[in-house]
Every structure is written in C-alpha cells, then in structure tokens.
Amino acid sequence: VAYLFSYKGRTALISGDTTKSANIQAFAAGIDLLVHEALSNTLVSAMHDAALAVGNLPRAMIFDDIHDYHTSPKEAAEIARDADVGHLLYYHVVPPLDVLGLEAVWLDGVDDIFQKYTLGQDGTSFSLPPNSREIIKTKSKL
C-alpha cells in the first residue's frame, strides 16, 4: 500500500509496509519526494541468529517473518532511481539505529544505487515549495 499526494505542482508518495513493488515504482515515476520504509536484511538476520542462540524462538520467528513485508534500503534506492524521483526519504527504519555504526551497515550499497536520500529520524521534515523543483529539508530530527 502507498499514498500519493499532489498539491500545486508537487508530488510525494508514502509507502506502507511492503516488499519492492512495481506498482509503487510506477506511481512514483517523476515525483518529487518518495517516503519509503525499509528493513536491513543484514541486521535483522543477525538479530534472528542472536535470538536463536539464546533460545528465544518466538522472537526468532518474528525476525524471520518480517522480511516478507518490508523493502530493503537498496531496493527502495532502486525504486527511487528507476522512477527518477527527486529525493528519497527513508522512514520506519528497521531495526532502530540506536547503536553507533549501525547506520553504515543499514545503508550499505545504497550510495551505489541512488545518492539523493535522507535517512529519516523522528521529526525529519521536508518542504516542497509550490510550482518549483526545490526540495528543502526543514528539520533533521526532533
């Protein structure tokens, strides 16, 4: 699922929890801002293995299942590149990147695909001035 918003010549699309989708890419074609969720398969797989190692099978099952309904950071970058969007904002970042160094692992390979992105945090916001091509990050975090 995704939501497409257009106003005064500007367009943004917000994805829901979803795997890489040709429909989202089609609706995102040429838009100004793609707001896309993403999950690091590398980090979540490590969490799965850690849960198994300590015998937490319910948690391991969750970490295994969530791959089925999330897009990876690289897949979201591919959508942004192939749809020729103005900017990609990652939101609903899984897992939370609350330990130093995780951001680099989460973003691994993204720069090789699409460079006009922001890794969102709570409070990140953008402005799309009417009838222009300008994309302005107005706030980086709370």
Question: For each of these PLM feature ranges, what is it?
Answer:
Residues 2, 8-11, 19-122:
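Cap/insert and terminal regions of metallo-dependent hydrolase folds
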Residues 119-142:
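Binuclear metal-dependent phosphoesterase catalytic core
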